[in-house]
Amino acid sequence: MSKPLIISFASKGRDNYLEASENVYLSVKDHWQYDYLFYTMDGNRNEFAGMKLTQITELPQPSTWTCNPHSVTPYQFKFGLIDHAREMGYDKIIWLDSSITLNKCPLKLLEQSNKGVMCFHNLGFETKDYISPECLAILSHKGYLQSNNPPQVWGGCIGFDFTKYSAKRIFDTIAIMSELGAFDNSPTFKNHRHDQAVMSMLFNYYDVLPYNYGHIVTNEHHENKEYGNYYTFVYGRNYRQA
């Protein structure tokens, strides 16, 4: 039997992600009937609105590789937490950043994805403007560079259906690229988008088809319904005021 999971992580960080994540918790409570893992660091609560929060002081680690803290390898923690959850037996895993809320259950969207990878076109942003030369060199050396400007995908909302071999292979490649330095900050290129840039390149290589904008929308388009009302995710929504 399938074991779906939504996973998220929050800390005080650059902004107060602990507070922003309350919107995530409320939307998951309303639109998700399966398991969830809400990790928090440097917070002081074990629950919010009846939703369990898992307090940690250091990142849970997958058994086959070491996940560095964000200060060492930016955003690698997302994939470490996903892989750790995979080892716990979860096989359909959706990652939500603290800026993303649900508008309806996303499981079907993940299950219908062409390679077992649910991702979304980040409309209006081009990958070539947000990827460092060091990252391009790593991807090229490993043979994953098919285009310098494939469609950019959202980094804050991603899903992997590990019941499909293609999703396992793609996820493992992302993790390997993070270990090789493709996520790292560049000393000369300040706009590198770390995991988002790497995923955009690898998804293009593996023929992953991103869902069009409209399956995920910004809060502005949630309010004015310019892209209709069939969307599953909303970026930047204050769910508490919905």
Locate predicted features.
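Short catalytic/ligand-binding loop motif for oxyanion handling, primarily in non-cytosolic enzymes
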Residues: 16, 45-48, 64-67, 102-105, ...
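A glycosyltransferase accessory/donor-loop signature
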Residues: 1-2, 8, 18, 102, ...
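GT-A fold catalytic core of metal-dependent nucleotide-sugar glycosyltransferases
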Residues: 78-133
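Short amphipathic alpha-helical face segments that pack within enzyme cores
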Residues: 23, 81, 197-201
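A structural signal for short, well-ordered beta-strand segments and their strand-loop junctions
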Residues: 37-40, 93-97, 102, 118-120, ...
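Short amphipathic alpha-helical segments and their helix-coil junctions
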Residues: 54-66, 137, 175-185
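N-terminal anchoring/stem segment of glycosyltransferases
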Residues: 1-67, 73, 87-91, 190-193, ...
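Short acidic (Asp/Glu) patches
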Residues: 75-80, 131-145
